[in-house]
């Protein structure tokens, strides 16, 4: 996920279709937590609905980018590898596999947005479909989670 400075806070999200703002809001929260907690922290989007927030875990060691998180019989995982190749451990408990999935979906959506900004108009429809799939899968993964 991008760790660059966010474009800003923006206004409140008024529509789930406002994907650009959703990702900008996500990046803002990630950057804010990095600035106020620790620059070595790895953040993961853990929000309700479209109100974004970040859960942060300290990066403890290096690993290859394609490492696989270790999942126990309950379906939870304690190791997560971000796109910079840093493994992060949850110091307060376990990270659920669904959060790892959300993290990857958002990274895919952000990449699609970058392509969208640099593409011709004929490709924009295709990228819009990719975004719809990403956020549709994200919504579906949330719906499958049992209430806390």
Curated annotation (Swiss-Prot):
Almost completely overlaps ARE1. Residues 65-85 are annotated as: Disordered. This is Putative uncharacterized protein YCR049C. The lineage of its organism: Eukaryota, Fungi, Dikarya, Ascomycota, Saccharomycotina. It comes from the Eukaryota. Residues 65-79 have a biased composition (Low complexity).
